[in-house]
């Protein structure tokens, strides 16, 4: 799957078959690799991924919309990278540098937060989740060794709501929230409220 092939499918199949929505894979930059799960380890919220460039992503949305198909994007807000890429400085699929050992992800930088994401922007729990009956552990410890965003942080909420707004402004009309049970409910409410404020015309 690439954004170009999805665009072609919209034109040749989904539109003519009156499909209303198509869900696509996470569109943000991720770690390198061809395996499906690499898309769920973001290193920035740039819309350049192994599926195509930002321009190709936006063109796909335009082509699908033209035949009556709206796009739902899979969104990864719970975590960044895991132990499989925790070996010093590396680069994502779009060339963004990050350090999975120290928790430094400058690619998440915004105008408000030019330093990007650092280790202090993650929950302090560094162990993997093992007890799914413990809500705090489920929502603050690591899923499969991946760094767990401190979603209660205003900084993290701002960066993530900006990302969702960028998707909305690109034409995405729905979100499938990956691993949302691992994020505090109040945090998701705050991110949604921020999104509503900044995505209004």
Describe the function of each predicted region:
Residues 183:
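Active-site environment of divalent metal-dependent phosphoester hydrolases
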């Amino acid at each position: 799957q690439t954004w170009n092939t999805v665009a072609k499918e919209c034109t040749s199949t989904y539109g003519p078959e009156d499909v209303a929505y198509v869900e696509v894979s996470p569109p943000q930059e991720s770690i390198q690799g061809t395996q499906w799960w690499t898309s769920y380890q973001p290193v920035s919220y740039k819309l350049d991924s192994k599926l195509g460039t930002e321009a190709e992503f936006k063109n796909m949305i335009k082509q699908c919309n033209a035949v009556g198909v709206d796009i739902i994007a899979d969104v990864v807000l719970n975590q960044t990278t895991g132990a499989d890429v925790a070996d010093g400085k590396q680069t994502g699929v779009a060339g963004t540098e990050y350090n999975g050992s120290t928790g430094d992800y400058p690619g998440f930088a915004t105008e408000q937060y030019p330093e990007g994401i650092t280790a202090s922007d993650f929950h302090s729990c560094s162990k993997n989740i093992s007890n799914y009956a413990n809500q705090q552990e489920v929502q603050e410890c690591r899923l499969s060794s991946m760094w767990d965003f401190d979603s209660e942080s205003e900084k993290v909420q701002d960066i993530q709501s900006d990302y969702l707004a960028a998707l909305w402004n690109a034409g995405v009309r729905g979100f499938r929230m990956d691993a949302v049970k691992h994020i505090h409910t109040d945090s998701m409410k705050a991110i949604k409220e921020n999104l509503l404020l900044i995505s209004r015309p």
